[in-house]
């Protein structure tokens, strides 16, 4: 099969809009009608072309797609969910050729379902939020939360990829690793030293191929430092590097934070987060396109294995068990037809933080009282299923700036056509950068929080665990269609105390689970949110930033000064971090809330594992994608070793 199988030759989506965009259909229509089409997704560079193949296969490509609806099919391993962890597991379990593997994915191929929104880095925001006007249910579950008291009773859209690649095809492409202390705390929590930082590192290295800042030229004032010991030369399937274009505002933020005493970090992948740095992304530095679990792990598996079978557009209804409580397969539904797929060795759930616990519960694994209320026979009474959900929010003020930013893409009649031409012809310009390329992490400083709150954080988290992350967001929190340049100094809470839940009110996985993250439910989180917002304002008001800020704060505006006013603004405008974890938490055998053991095996049954972010015992500081890839590598290696 030729490498152009999924080549997109015309602009498939409307241009990106500002973060949290409430799309103005009139503006979009008039803008789109005058744009040059987004051309073929390949550069003229020969090496880049070699690095760019998408769907190729060993033998017939069609041999890797399962026979839908045929009875009696069984495989050694059945993986539910072709996302971040699922495709990494599929690649490793099928790699030596001795085991047959089936991947069951509810969605399809994002290249055909979402076009360039999943390929061009800056186009990620096209479907990043749901405002009722622009929507694509082909590659997202369109999950909504219950009304959130901490967020002005809003029912929040919660992005969850429903596609091969999962949320790696939907998210912000940010790649980093947690702090050393976070992984050591994981090891202590589950009673397994294989989760300490030094034991994690080989799996981090095995999952990614790092291309340093020297791969593409960078401005002299945008130096990116890296600890090269965090990566290996051989690396793994997932390309990690820096966006080709550096956001102009980021060098100003770098200078401002340096003057404020933030130390320079070495890339956020060596286990040390505290400090400031340009951040790496899962972007192929040669093609300047999004890299996903599908374009990396799945591509490798198809090219090098002949024992992998993929079932797309197929929803898993429940896990099947024999009378010894061993998982023997799954019941699935493909376009209304219900049938079964058998598992000779194990079933592996990689359906994510919301749908892995849902699948457990409809299969009889979960809180006994809740399952009995729904008439579901109880197979394993695990009270922790669906509990312990942890996530954070992103917040911050917006100001006009004197340098070009991504906010110009909407409303400026010259900027977007120019950006498309630059991307088409040279793979450069605004579209190569998703809009957030500079981060900082900080512990709470004296006086930022109440003494009691600071003491609680110090008692609950390791010394190297940051309290806040700061993001130089090259856009606005609320869209401005005037074509001007705006910048949002943003923050996220790294030590939230609020805990949410995922529950069900139906025994049918076609019905969405009930998701209640409980953002800002804990008063300490509210206090941290206000402190983070004030810190963002402090950065923007610094001497360095005054030179580039073009006017007064536009959002929320200088009239918001008291803690109550700021908290109300945060409640009304902040958004999900889309980094939920913990709903099938890993723990020790005597932990009443544990769902899986340290080998990811579901307690109380046999032949069933979960490998995804739902088994994190707690939220790692920052984005979880890098840790999910490494977790899949770790569990797969242990399974292949007979554990």
Curated annotation (Swiss-Prot):
* Compartment(s) where it occurs, according to its Swiss-Prot or TrEMBL record: Cytoplasm, Cytosol
**Annotated GO MF terms:** cyclase activity; flavin adenine dinucleotide binding; hydro-lyase activity; oxidoreductase activity, acting on CH-OH group of donors; protein homodimerization activity; versicolorin B synthase activity
Binding-site positions, FAD: 84-85, 105-106, 171-174, 613, 624-625
Swiss-Prot/TrEMBL cofactor(s): FAD
Reported function: Dual cyclase; part of the gene cluster that mediates the biosynthesis of aflatoxins, a group of polyketide-derived furanocoumarins, and part of the most toxic and carcinogenic compounds among the known mycotoxins. The four major aflatoxins produced by A.parasiticus are aflatoxin B1 (AFB1), aflatoxin B2 (AFB2), aflatoxin G1 (AFG1) and aflatoxin G2 (AFG2).
State how it assembles.
Answer: Homodimer.
Name the chain's protein. Answer: Versicolorin B synthase
Gene name of the record: aflK
């Amino acid at each position: 099969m030729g490498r152009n199988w999924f080549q997109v030759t015309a602009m498939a989506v409307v241009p990106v809009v500002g973060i949290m965009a409430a799309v103005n259909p009139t503006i979009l229509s008039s803008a789109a009608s005058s744009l040059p089409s987004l051309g073929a997704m390949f550069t003229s560079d020969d090496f880049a072309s070699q690095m760019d193949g998408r769907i190729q296969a060993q033998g017939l490509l069609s041999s890797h797609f399962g026979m839908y609806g045929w009875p009696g099919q069984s495989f050694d391993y059945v993986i539910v969910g072709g996302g971040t962890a699922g495709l990494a597991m599929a690649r490793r379990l099928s790699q030596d050729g001795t085991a047959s593997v089936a991947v069951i994915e509810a969605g399809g191929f994002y290249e055909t379902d979402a076009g360039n929104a999943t390929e061009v880095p800056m186009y990620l925001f096209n479907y990043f939020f749901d405002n009722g006007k622009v929507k694509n249910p082909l590659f997202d579950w369109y999950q909504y939360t219950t009304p959130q008291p901490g967020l002005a009773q809003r029912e929040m859209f919660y992005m969850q990829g429903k596609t091969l690649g999962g949320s790696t095809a939907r998210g912000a492409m940010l790649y980093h690793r947690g702090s050393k202390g976070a992984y050591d705390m994981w090891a202590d929590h589950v009673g397994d030293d294989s989760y300490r930082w030094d034991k994690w590192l080989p799996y981090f290295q095995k999952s990614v191929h790092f291309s340093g800042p020297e791969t593409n030229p960078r401005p002299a004032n945008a130096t990116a430092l890296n600890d090269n010991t965090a990566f290996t030369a051989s690396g793994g399937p997932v390309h990690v590097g820096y966006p080709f274009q550096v956001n102009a505002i980021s060098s100003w933020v770098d200078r401002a934070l340096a003057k404020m005493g933030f130390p320079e970090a070495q890339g956020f992948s060596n286990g040390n987060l505290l400090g400031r740095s340009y951040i790496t992304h899962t972007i192929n530095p040669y093609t300047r396109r999004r890299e996903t679990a599908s374009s990396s792990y799945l591509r490798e598996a198809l090219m090098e294995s002949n024992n992998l079978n993929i079932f797309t557009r197929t929803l898993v209804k429940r896990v099947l068990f024999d009378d010894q409580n061993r998982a023997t397969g799954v019941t699935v539904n493909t376009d209304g037809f219900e049938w079964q797929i058998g598992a000779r060795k194990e079933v592996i759930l990689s359906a994510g933080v919301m749908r892995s616990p849902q699948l457990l519960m409809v299969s009889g694994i979960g809180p006994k009282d809740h399952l009995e209320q729904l008439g579901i026979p109880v197979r394993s009474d695990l009270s922790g299923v669906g509990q312990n959900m942890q996530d954070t929010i992103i917040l911050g003020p917006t100001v006009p700036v004197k340098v070009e930013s991504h906010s110009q893409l909407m409303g400026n009649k010259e900027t977007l056509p120019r950006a498309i031409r630059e991307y088409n012809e040279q793979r450069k310009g605004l579209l190569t950068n998703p809009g957030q390329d500079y981060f900082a992490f900080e512990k709470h400083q004296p006086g930022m929080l109440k003494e009691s709150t600071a003491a609680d954080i110090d008692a609950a988290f390791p010394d190297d665990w940051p309290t806040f992350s700061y993001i130089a967001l090259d856009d606005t929190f609320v869209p401005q269609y005037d074509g001007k340049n705006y910048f949002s100094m943003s923050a996220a809470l790294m030590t939230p105390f609020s805990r949410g839940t995922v529950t069900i009110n139906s025994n049918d996985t076609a019905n969405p689970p009930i998701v209640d993250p409980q953002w800002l439910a804990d008063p300490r989180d509210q206090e941290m949110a206000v402190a983070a917002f004030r810190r963002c304002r402090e950065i923007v008001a610094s001497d360095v930033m005054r030179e580039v800020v073009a006017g007064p704060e536009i959002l929320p505006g200088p009239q918001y000064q008291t803690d109550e006013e700021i908290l109300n603004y945060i409640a009304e405008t902040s958004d999900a971090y889309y980094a939920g974890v913990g709903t099938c938490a890993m723990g020790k055998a005597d932990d009443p809330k544990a769902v899986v053991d340290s080998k990811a095996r579901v307690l109380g049954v046999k032949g069933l594992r979960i490998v995804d972010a739902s088994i994190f015992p707690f939220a790692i500081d920052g984005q979880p994608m890098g840790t999910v890839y490494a977790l899949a590598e770790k569990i797969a290696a242990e399974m292949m070793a007979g554990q």
